[in-house]
Amino acid sequence: MRHRVKKKKLNRPHSQRLALMRGLARELFEHGTIITTTAKAKAVKPFVESIITKAKKAALYAKEINERSNGDPEIQALRSKNVALRREINRHFNDRKLVKKICDEIAVNYIDRNGGYTRIIKVGRRRGDAAELSILQLVETKSEENVEN
């Protein structure tokens, strides 16, 4: 019975599955969209969304740090929370430039959005093995949609 079993195994051992998740998430954050199998897209979506949620919290702390004066006693606590969240994100990728991009560019776009940062669009089947392919992409924010129109 599969009671309370949430994650997909993708027919891989734990270390390979974790490496796959990190690789897919890295490509998604770098390029904004990736084409992969539907099973992999569904498996990586919660991983990406949790990272964006942590980055949003770090971005909010950074914004509050910038708004407060340097003499404020709570500013040190905010800085430590911001650094802790960035380190938690960095634990997955081990790339400071990518963490900076996630926290300072990507997460800022989703400050007003409560979840649902990615979308999966099914595009058909792969030619070689007929695996179902999907596009996993970051959802555009309202500010980007207004610029395009």
From Swiss-Prot:
It comes from the Bacteria. Pfam families: Ribosomal_L17 (PF01196). The keyword Ribonucleoprotein applies. One of its GO terms (biological process) is translation. One of its GO terms (cellular component) is cytosolic large ribosomal subunit. Part of the 50S ribosomal subunit. Contacts protein L32. Belongs to the bacterial ribosomal protein bL17 family. This is Large ribosomal subunit protein bL17.
